[in-house]
């Protein structure tokens, strides 16, 4: 999926497109942009993701998010090259998602009247900042790093700011957080 990513306006009536290297967060008409891919991922990736559950010493295979890096390859890198992953992908030694593996919750399933093997929960509190926001923020800071951003700005009352600040600091990028008056979590 190399050379596959681009930005596209989420408004179907607009549909403006931009290169992935763009720093735009909105299209020229003021609508939000989303990362899109020209091609669908090959079905053989399921096997690759399954095999990566046994990390084989790669921090990017341990990571909850970068284990699926082919689906998030907006950096357009060789996803099997540890050197390229280390250079471009933001990671705290694979800690994001490492401990937050899903657990089978048989007592909760019984309480809900569901099949005891059908309910799995993933404790996101094990992420480095203690927040579920780490999964998305690691990709946001990777994109910021890719486009050469000097600063990340977010509005948050808690989880987003903790995650943004932590990953930005790890990459040497300034981070400004704006909190609405009287809205601290």
Regions found by a protein language model. Give the residues of each.
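PLP-dependent amino-acid enzyme catalytic core
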Residues: 1-185
């Amino acid at each position: 999926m190399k050379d596959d990513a681009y930005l596209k306006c989420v408004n179907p009536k607009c549909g403006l497109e931009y290169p992935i290297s763009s720093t735009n967060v909105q299209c020229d008409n003021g609508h939000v942009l989303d990362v899109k891919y020209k091609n669908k991922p090959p079905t053989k990736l399921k096997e690759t993701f399954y095999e990566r559950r046994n990390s084989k010493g790669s921090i990017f295979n341990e990571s909850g998010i970068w284990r699926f890096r082919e689906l998030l390859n907006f950096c357009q890198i060789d996803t099997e090259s540890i050197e390229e992953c280390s250079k471009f992908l933001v990671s705290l030694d694979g800690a994001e998602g490492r401990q937050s593996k899903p657990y089978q919750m048989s007592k909760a399933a019984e309480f809900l009247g569901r099949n005891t093997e059908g309910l799995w929960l993933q404790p996101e509190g094990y992420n480095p900042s203690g927040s579920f926001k780490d999964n998305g923020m690691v990709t946001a800071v990777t994109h910021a790093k890719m486009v050469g951003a000097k600063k990340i700005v977010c509005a948050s009352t808690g989880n987003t700011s903790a995650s943004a600040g932590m990953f930005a600091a790890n990459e040497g990028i300034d981070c400004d957080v704006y909190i609405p008056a009287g809205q601290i979590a």
